Every structure is written in structure tokens, then in C-alpha cells.
């Protein structure tokens, strides 16, 4: 009888361990649109993941949450922003999936064509370093400003307003917190808005933007990011594979109509 009890104890222990593994929650911080929507779709197609989506609100730094262990991954940022955050926080993170692009767009409630922009028009742009640079390159691509010589590749040269060489319309560049820019549309002539914030505001980038960032060779693909210690965690790897799957790519294409563009799962 005592001999028989050991296998039973082993079975009980195995069941308990299996339960604990299954119960382990994978907490991922994400912007509400489209990131959290995409993650919630993953929950539907892969019930083996015990995924908890933490929707970010303004003022919360998802990389600080990750560094502090409050979440196991985040999904909201592109590589240039991530690299700036690593420097600012003194942390090293790990990219485990490259998922989609949200083209930056120029929007207006005042004009219907960029040719109609008046002299000394006000332009709201993101105030964080990487997206500010991205906005200036978009304004240059649409003929509104010209940056200094050599500023042709946003992946290589980060631009600031001091790098504007030509501003023929004397545009006034106003740096604003990215989530607040859609609310400023009635107060400025032009607004350069990140794709996710445009979608949250009810805009359709592929239709409403007067100028839209090209997806070709775009360095701003959105990433699933974790810590080096967790990058080989089975749940993290499973989520990464799901996000880069053809199913998720199809979901993005069908639901965002060119306003969000998949870069994996083609």
C-alpha cells in the first residue's frame, strides 16, 4: 500500500503542476486600437493562451510596466521609439514579433487638400522624439517643408524642427502629446496623427488623411516586446507566432481596410 501511494502522489503533483502552468496568466499591455483588438482576436483563435490584455490609457508607460514586471509583454510601439525608451529607462528589451504598420497621416478640419494650406498655418505634431521626426519626414514627403541636406531616411537620421531648411508657408509647428492631437483638429490647420490614435478618434486613415505615410520600407512596424529573460517563454513564443500568422494578417486586412497594414503572415 505504501508503494502504491507514491505513484498516486506523483500523479496528484503532476496534475497540480499542470493546473498551475495552465493558470499562469500572460499579461500584455497594449493600446486599445488596433493592438488590443488584435490581441482579443488572438484570444479567440488560440484558447490555449491564458492571455490578459491590459489596455493602456494616457500617461501610462508600457515599457516601465514591462521593466517592473507588471506585465510580461507589450504591444504598442515601433523600433525607433523602443530604442529611445531603452536609453531613457536604462533597460534592455527583446523584440519577439513584428506585426503591423499604422501609417502616420496628415488630417484637417480646415482644408480638403494640402494645396489649400495657407501661409502661417498651424500644424500639430507628436511631441515625442521619434514620432516628431516621423511627422517632419511626412510633411517633407508632401512638399510642405524641406529638411536639411542628408535628411532623406527616417531610419538613419532623426529630425527635429531645427532641421527644417525650407518652410515656404512659414508653418507653425506645435508639439502636442500624441493622444491629444485628434482633439486639437478644430484648433489647428493641420494635425499629424499616429494611426492608432486616428482610429480611436473615428478617423479612417486610408480615406480621411490628406497625406499618408508609405508602407514601403517603413521602419515603423509595431512590435511585440518582452524582456530578454522571457523571450523564450513558451507562452510568449506562442503569442508571437499567433501575431505573425496568416490568420491575424487576414483579420487586419479585413477589419482596417488599409488603415493598418500587416507586415507578417503574408
Regions found by a protein language model. Give the residues of each.
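Sec/Tat signal peptide C-region and signal peptidase I cleavage site
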Residues: 17-23
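Short, polar/charged alpha-helical segment
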Residues: 29-52, 61, 65
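Short helices/loops that flank or line small-molecule/ion binding pockets
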Residues: 45, 60-74, 87-88, 136-138, ...
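Short beta-strand-to-loop elements that line the ligand-binding cleft
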Residues: 50-58, 148-156, 170-176
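Ligand-binding "clamshell"
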Residues: 84-96, 109-111, 185-187, 192, ...
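A conserved helix-loop-strand patch within extracytoplasmic ligand-binding domains
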Residues: 96-146, 249
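Periplasmic-binding protein-like
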Residues: 97-108, 133-140, 199, 203-266
Amino acid at each position: 500500500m505504501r508503494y502504491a501511494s507514491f505513484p498516486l502522489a506523483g500523479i496528484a503533483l503532476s496534475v497540480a503542476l499542470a493546473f498551475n502552468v495552465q493558470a499562469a496568466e500572460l499579461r500584455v499591455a497594449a493600446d486599445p486600437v488596433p493592438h488590443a483588438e488584435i490581441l482579443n482576436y488572438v484570444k479567440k483563435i488560440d484558447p490555449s493562451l491564458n492571455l490578459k490584455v491590459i489596455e493602456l490609457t494616457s500617461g501610462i508607460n508600457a515599457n516601465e510596466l514591462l521593466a517592473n514586471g507588471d506585465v510580461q509583454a507589450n504591444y504598442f510601439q515601433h523600433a525607433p521609439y523602443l530604442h529611445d525608451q531603452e536609453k531613457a529607462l536604462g533597460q534592455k528589451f527583446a523584440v519577439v514579433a513584428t506585426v503591423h504598420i499604422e501609417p502616420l497621416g496628415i488630417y484637417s478640419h480646415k482644408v480638403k487638400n494640402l494645396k489649400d494650406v495657407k501661409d502661417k498655418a498651424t500644424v500639430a505634431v507628436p511631441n515625442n522624439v521619434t514620432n516628431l521626426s516621423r511627422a517632419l519626414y511626412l510633411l517633407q514627403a508632401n512638399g510642405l517643408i524641406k529638411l536639411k541636406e542628408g535628411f532623406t531616411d527616417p531610419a538613419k537620421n532623426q529630425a527635429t524642427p531645427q532641421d527644417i531648411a525650407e518652410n515656404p508657408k512659414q508653418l507653425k509647428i506645435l508639439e502636442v502629446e500624441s493622444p491629444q492631437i485628434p482633439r486639437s483638429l478644430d484648433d489647428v490647420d493641420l494635425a499629424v496623427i499616429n494611426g492608432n490614435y486616428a482610429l480611436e478618434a473615428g478617423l479612417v486613415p486610408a480615406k480621411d488623411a490628406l497625406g499618408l505615410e508609405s508602407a514601403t520600407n517603413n521602419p515603423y512596424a509595431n512590435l511585440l516586446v518582452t524582456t530578454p529573460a522571457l523571450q523564450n517563454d513558451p507562452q510568449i513564443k506562442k503569442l508571437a507566432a499567433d501575431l505573425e500568422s496568416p490568420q491575424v494578417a487576414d483579420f487586419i486586412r479585413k477589419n482596417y481596410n488599409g488603415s493598418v497594414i500587416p507586415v507578417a503572415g503574408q
